[in-house]
Amino acid sequence: MTINDLTNKVILVLGLTEYHKDLVQNYIQDAIDYMRSSGVSDSIIYSQRSVGPLVMYVNDIWNYTQGQTRISELFEQRVIQLSYEGDDEDV
């Protein structure tokens, strides 16, 4: 799966429009960087298994109140779980 595929899935789940695609893709890249630095393998990041956490992250950032931006605990917990799973081929 490519970043464009992931972006399209996140946009669909959140009910956003194509107009916001570039912004959403920037948020997704930020989430991917976070996941990668947390030890999640690229094979998991670029799979269906990361769509849920990516949706959570984009939703957190999309709906922030100025000065109170936080990523959700659920996103953080899911990233931790995925980091322990190793490559898709090993699961």
What residue spans do the PLM features occupy?
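Divalent metal-cofactor coordination and adjacent catalytic microenvironments
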Residues: 1-91
